[in-house]
Amino acid sequence: MFGILNRGHKIKGTVVLMTKNVFDFNEFVSTTRGGIVGAAGGLFGAATDIVGGIVDGATAIFSRNIAIQLISATKTDGLGNGKVGKQTFLEKHLPSLPNLGDRQDAFNVYFEWDENFGIPEAFYIKNFMQSEFFLVSLTLEDIPNHGTIHFVCNSWVYNAKSYKRDRIFFANKTYLPNETPASLVKYRKEELENLRGDGTGERKEYDRIYDYAVYNDLGNPDKNKNLARTTLGGSSDFPYPRRGRTGRKSTRKDPKCEIPTSDTYIPRDENFGHLKSGDFLTYAIKSLTQNVLPTFQKAFGFNNEFDTFEDVRGLFEGGLYLPTDVISKISPIPVLKEILRTDGEQVLKFPPPHVIRVTKSAWMTDEEFGREMLAGVNPCLIQRLQEFPPKSKLDVTVYGDQTSTMTKEHLEINLGGLTVEEALHGNRLFILDHHDAFIPYLERINDLPTAKCYATRTILFLKDDNTLKPLAIELSLPNPGGKGANSRVILPADGGAESTIWLLAKAYVVVNDSCYHQLMSHWLNTHAVMEPFVIATNRHLSVLHPIYKLLLPHYRDTMNINALARQSLINAGGVIERSFLPGEFAVEMSSAVYKSWVFTDQALPADLIKRGMAVEDPSSPYGLRLVVEDYPYAVDGLEIWDTIQTWVKDYVSLYYPTNDAVKKDTELQAWWKEAVEKGHGDLKDKPWWPKLNTPQDLIHTCSIIIWIASALHAAVNFGQYPYGGFILNRPTITRRLLPEPGTKEYGELTSNYQKAYLRTITGKVEAIVDLSVIEILSRHASDEVYLGQRDNPNWTNNIKALQAFKRFGQKLKEIEEKIMGRNKDSSLRNRNGPVKMPYTVLLPTCEDEGLTFRGIPNSISI
């Protein structure tokens, strides 16, 4: 008889779960709150409590402690809700089930069934143990007249007393709200209510509640008044995307600010439950920033200078001697031991960054300086110059006239006979403009004890070989007498003091760019803007909703890494403030940039057109033509953007054939309304927000979200160490202004240009801090899930959706081959540049872990 097992009228199921990991981040923090020293014993001593004696026999522990009840989608009880079956418990442990993942355990479970129960498409689960577990999946086999049903769960399940309602999971079927079987409507609605909460109280570890809050937890005024920071979000002066609400208590000194903590709440399922302990990268960041980096200050603080470029290269060749107390804080931590490469010796040694692996000094060339604006770690800021001289968008009544002081004569010296007008008309002049972002803060930045810098504008010329040649750099300071700026224009030079001044001018540009990249291009434009979409999706789109299934992989670990950033990276006194020029003003500067953020401009074609890097052209691929044909980020990115949009169109079309289908989807409309009005509430009245009235609106909106989470983040994140690991190439701080003629420092420009450069840029301690962190941020985990991949093949039961997804993956493989082919084309000089470093960061996949400089993860997970 089909579907009926020998055990009688019973359905066989297989439950896959993971026990609580000994390296679970929150648990580790709580067990090692006193510091890392001596943590080896404490950590492994805690393992017994965490695992809960699982080694004594999984079957004995789980057999009467985890109960499941099936819920019918086709048969109802007296109230019209799906029938709930009898409670049944896990049975036999299956230690060798095929395809069982790392640290996963499988168990049999048997359910009584008869035809009056119908088809189960949901289930309740209760955990009667004190320790939580991570439920991966439930698979029901041979349902009579139906076959196999998959439940993809991926959720932490705590003791049943932790929840007001029983935990419920749904099968991998997809229903629009108005198509939901009547028997499941109540369950679908209640689960969303569970996830929204009531907006009150302090969140507990086991909570799964998603809600919004402003960025009021970066400072710590109770500890030190100098650690007070402006609240970002909730005002027109300091607008910001929202973060996840924690409900923590306020500080004593400022009731509007939350008390910072090392145990920041995020909804439990947003916490890492899948990483192997050996490459728990965010755990490494936490340990590094709180325990190891302070010892670097002690170890190297007495001599915070590199004396030669060779000293800097020594970080990757011979290494730096480390005192014993520093080693003792690294050795118990496998990730740090690997990253900092002490190898049991008292030497700190970093891996060679890609930018110096082939040539040691090509980073200094003007061609590489220009190339990295097209194929570096921040390739989405350069613009085509469309008016000369460049003008400012700053308020004239506040800042005065900030128009550039560059003249035609400054440029035409190196234009090869062209006039500025001819070069402008021929689309051959480009600008990297950091003036407006820095001028409002520069006076305060330069008052900091270790920071001295300029606001910069750089104009470049597009040569016949498609490379960019820098023509002039403008260095500006606020006018000490009032409004306007004091500016100086620096031109390229080949010898003497002038050549060192040119090298220093490029350093001021790169420091502007490094800071803008880290705070705006990277943190704000990917991490921060994505979190509201994560929150709104979980609050308003059921797991049964097609758009939930589409977007879910692109949210993986984002809230977790963002919470970690607030704790250790962008917080008051954190890594960014200590190792980047703006110091305490860093995150506040990103708020000023958010004022002009436009959601629809995040689509790559719109971004390129807005920056003048492309023009609309119906006869060209993707409907636009690049002004710089050899623009690696744009060329590779457009292929990926188009493929993402095609996949989203194929998928959305399966569920939304008409405009009405979009308009009448109550969950969808509530999702987008809240994402805009609450998640990005400070910009909610902007006219550019799309309305979800048509399938095309939905396709474009989802494509932008996926693009930001995947390719855009990959482009601005995974090149950080390959380019910036060599601090000479991408310094993060300048500590002094250009020297005045007649001074000792001016004499060094000719007598010892390396010393002049090194005394100007990032010092030794700050460089080590920066390198230590960006190496972690640039790494891929061993279980990374890349664009075109899913962590579970049963994420949907829709065959057409699975087929469309397969086409998506195949297309990405084709793009990968094209990118590798372009990198081998010697006529495309910007693909490798003088440093001979192929542009691989947008290769979609990667088979290796670590510092690969390739691979597009689905989500912002690091």
From Swiss-Prot:
Q: Coiled-coil regions in this chain?
A: none
Q: Which top-level enzyme class is recorded in the Swiss-Prot or TrEMBL entry?
A: oxidoreductase
Which cofactors is this protein said to need?
Fe cation
Q: Name the segments for region: Disordered.
A: 225-257
| Residues of the PLAT domain | 44-171
Q: Name the major location.
A: cytoplasm
Which InterPro entries does this UniProt record tie to the protein? LipOase, LipOase_C, LipOase_C_sf, LipOase_CS, LipOase_Fe_BS, LipOase_plant, Lipoxy_PLAT/LH2, Lipoxygenase_dom_3
Q: Where does Fe cation bind?
A: H522, H527, H713, N717, I862
What pathway does the annotation place this protein in? Lipid metabolism; oxylipin biosynthesis
Query: Which residues belong to any copy of the Lipoxygenase domain?
Result: 174-862
Complexes and interactors: Monomer.
Family to which this protein belongs:
Belongs to the lipoxygenase family.
- Name of the protein in its database record: Linoleate 9S-lipoxygenase 1
The coding gene here is: LOXA
